[in-house]
């Protein structure tokens, strides 16, 4: 199982935004510089986050982005869904007639990977942006 850079960067950028948006709106340029993420890539990500009402943009010379919700109400699953990130541990589609291995059956370890996927998704559903902020404060020196 692997998350794409889109999902990882969305989470990183939102943690960065949450750290600073209580002062003023945060520019994507500032997030880009602090996190080492391409500005063009951030613009694509934030377009999706805005469309899904996780962030809102503020126009003007002091403009930028702010969270649209309390960090405690933004779960990692919300972020992943907003940027079209899906956590998958199996390659097959549940509704596929071909099964996992191109046959009409599931692979021998299918249920193991299905259960793992369920645990991972539950973990992400229970982790909020606020949790990551708290964890970040504890680990920073």
Description of each model-found segment:
Residues 10-22:
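Short amphipathic alpha-helical interface segments
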Residues 26-36:
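A short alpha-helical element within helix-turn-helix/winged-helix DNA-binding domains
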Residues 40:
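Key DNA-contact positions within bacterial/archaeal DNA-binding proteins
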Residues 45-50:
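Basic amphipathic alpha-helical segments that dock to polyanions
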Residues 51-54, 82:
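Residue cluster at the C-terminal edge of the helix-turn-helix DNA-binding motif
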Residues 54-62, 66-67:
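Beta-hairpin "wing" of winged helix-turn-helix
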Residues 76, 92-141:
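C-terminal regulatory/oligomerization modules of transcriptional regulators
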């Amino acid at each position: 199982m692997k998350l794409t850079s889109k999902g990882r960067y969305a989470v990183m950028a939102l943690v960065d935004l949450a750290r600073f948006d209580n002062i003023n709106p945060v520019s994507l340029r500032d997030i880009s510089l602090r996190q080492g993420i391409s500005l063009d890539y951030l613009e694509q990500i934030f377009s999706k986050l805005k469309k899904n009402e996780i962030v809102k943009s503020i126009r003007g010379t002091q403009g930028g982005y702010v969270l649209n919700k309390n960090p405690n109400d933004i779960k990692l699953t919300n972020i992943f869904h907003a940027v079209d990130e899906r956590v998958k541990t199996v390659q097959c589609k549940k509704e596929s007639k071909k099964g996992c291995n191109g046959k009409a059956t599931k692979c021998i370890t299918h249920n193991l990977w299905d259960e793992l996927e369920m645990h991972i998704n539950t973990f992400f559903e229970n982790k909020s942006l606020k949790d990551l902020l708290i964890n970040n404060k504890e680990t920073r020196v």
